Design a protein with these regions (language model features):
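Structural/interface elements that position substrates and couple domains in central-metabolism enzymes
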Residues: 1-276
Length: 276
């Protein structure tokens, strides 16, 4: 492969992966409206060998340095040649919208004025196993919550020092004063009105739900990475808001399509509260 094609391949690969993520996020948002479960949809379409399972997880949007940078770089390069990459423009627009999803869900649940409310946020880095905060969805969520008047307690297994540095640049002094950097996941929950999960760290996948419930003022979880099964969370007494897991309102609405006899949903692994 020649050098120019090799360089193009690197950018094209990241653009393709970003496109898969944004498409799944669009489908997840529609699934919430119609009462479908995007996790079931993911498994279904991923079983098609033409598609595969990689990068089909819906969530709170992508971040980091590579995907955003490479998508924009390809679009800018196309512009210099008088071309417009419409799909990649849409991929970026969808991702920017998706990074605001958790904030919209929280504001939709509690109203636009969050003065006097306190939220716990688990996960600050843009993905697990790094402290990289570049274009991390958590930064968007924190700005939304703080500018609506809330206070927050944040925790990340690795990114706390980098988060402190980054948020000092992101936030106004009065906003930063309403951020507490917690020492542990449960420490972040103390007195919170709800928990928001933004990064899919392994440490968050199998928590002690009894302790979570005891620490929160109300058992409410906004899960931006679909770590848990809605049916199991309901059995444990949590109000659970995932991404594309199908709202109760939509599920209760009549469908024009014939429906199979109802069957009790189970978690993806017997006895497990977490996804595969």
């Amino acid at each position: 492969m020649d050098v120019r094609s090799a360089e193009f391949t690197k950018y094209a690969a990241n653009a393709m992966l970003a496109t898969r993520i944004s498409l799944m996020n669009e489908l997840a948002n529609l699934a919430d409206c119609v009462g479908a479960d995007i996790e079931a949809v993911r498994r279904g379409i991923g079983s098609d060998p033409r598609i595969g399972h990689g990068f089909l997880y819906a969530g709170a949007g992508y971040g980091g340095s590579c995907f955003p940078k490479d998508v924009r770089a390809l679009a800018r390069t196309a512009g210099r040649f008088g071309q417009e990459l419409l799909i990649l423009r849409a991929v970026e627009a969808v991702n920017q919208h998706q990074q605001q999803l958790l904030g919209r869900k929280i504001l939709g649940r509690y109203g636009d004025d969050l003065d006097g409310m306190h939220f716990a946020v688990w996960g600050l880095a843009f993905k697990p196993n790094t402290d990289d905060m570049r274009e991390a969805p958590a930064r968007v969520l924190l700005r939304q919550l703080l500018r609506a008047g809330a206070t927050v307690a944040v925790y990340d297994p690795v990114a706390m020092a980098e988060a402190a540095r980054t948020l000092a640049l992101d936030l106004r002094a009065d906003e930063l004063a309403r951020v507490r950097f917690a020492a542990a996941p449960l420490d972040a929950l103390a007195g919170a009105d709800a928990l928001a999960i933004v990064t899919e760290w392994k440490a968050f996948r199998s928590p002690d739900f009894g302790k979570i419930k005891a620490a929160l003022k109300q058992p409410v979880i906004f899960d931006g990475r679909n770590l848990f099964e809605p049916e199991a969370m309901d059995e444990y007494g949590f109000e659970y808001h995932g991404v594309g897991r199908g709202s109760r309102l939509a599920k209760d609405a009549p469908s024009s399509a014939p429906r199979a006899p109802a069957r009790r949903a189970v978690s993806q692994h017997a006895g497990s509260l977490t996804r595969a």
